[in-house]
């Protein structure tokens, strides 16, 4: 993006400059990207073998593809200093009041509850690697509307999921599509 495109914008980025302690997670992967990390994520999610195979193939593609050079300088990214899976809660809540307080505080800072009340028919709130809150208007659910996070869709509709997952932007598309396909969550 050119400087001209952003020079007149008055954006306060400090609003989003916060993070939580890693001690609050019910599960946190080791830092670093490896075949073992990819396997750990799949095992934590109790995924079918085909998904583990997809993840591992995507990881191999990621390792072989060069860093893109068409955008900003990404050479300083340390892929071994990243947690690729962090689970903040043991379950997905249907009532916002039941979401853990530390997670609610983060979403309150971002204005998520207000956005749902004002504009959305359904919402899934993802915190780190997992969905912690999921809501769909009852009238839409009765009409057969499916609104699921990807983890639940994989469980509830495995054939549909397998048919469409990773098709629009396949892991072969670019290095970061491959990374996403290897370690996706939520």
Where are these regions (language model features)?
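Glycine-rich and polybasic anion-binding loops at the starts of cofactor/ligand-binding domains
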Residues: 2-186
